[in-house]
């Protein structure tokens, strides 16, 4: 049985509010709909209850992936065990308040899912479960492949602005406008997740552009995780610091400093370069009056730029 996470500190900062929006979409929409439709869902590592007999029958916890909860969930359901997701019963959880800790968490979840996909998908397709479950399980376990695609889209968006204005390609670019439907469907998913659980959902859904920019900004961090997972490069399980932050007046830095991330990753340099590339693209789009490209490139610029600056700022603060 898996319950929905409820956030103790979602109002602590813009960072925690954006995370809450993302996780609400996962629990309220993805987990609930998957479960009701009869597809496999995953235990989220906490806020749930297992039968001991289920764990043992599925082969027990295994340390060969970074997402042992996802791995065990699929092995159990392939054995015929049924999972239940309860949306109306919530369990308190603390969101990461520090960007480098969030990066580590996202890296772990992304890489672990790829490792689990490589391990579990052969078992899924050899099993006797219905084809629709096999297909959806494949989409579920490989969905993090989207991060390299997001990164590539950001890189290519800049030269595409130039190409569009130096040749007769209008009909091709007109066809590409269909991809705006992806933004609309994503917005609707998160809107309904907020509407389902919050009376003030209209105030919360305004964070959607922040969430989208953040997702783009995490593309580089998570692409590295995808590549390492595909190449079987092993890494340690880096825990997410918890500071018992329940309001915006709590000060996290004196508490549990040994868990704080104090190293400035070389990845930040790449994030800054990507931000400058997007900024150049914004200037190019303005020069060619490609107004439609500016919001897209702006989200890349803000995503990479803000995450890079916050990474440096939070690492330096943790050293104090």
Regions found by a protein language model. Give the residues of each.
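Conserved glycosyltransferase catalytic-site signature
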Residues: 66-71, 210
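Loop-to-transmembrane boundary segments
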Residues: 126-149, 244-280
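Membrane-embedded multi-pass helical conduit in multi-pass membrane proteins
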Residues: 143-236, 242, 266-320
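Generic structural signal for helix capping and beta-alpha/helix-loop junctions
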Residues: 10, 93-94
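Long helical/loop segments within the catalytic core of UDP-sugar-dependent glycosyltransferases
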Residues: 1-66, 77-78, 99-138, 142
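Catalytic donor-sugar/metal-binding loop of nucleotide-sugar-dependent glycosyltransferases
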Residues: 64, 73-92
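Conserved helix-loop functional segments at active or binding sites
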Residues: 24-27, 52, 89, 123, ...
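Nucleotide-sugar-dependent glycosyltransferase catalytic core
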Residues: 94-111, 200-209, 234-252
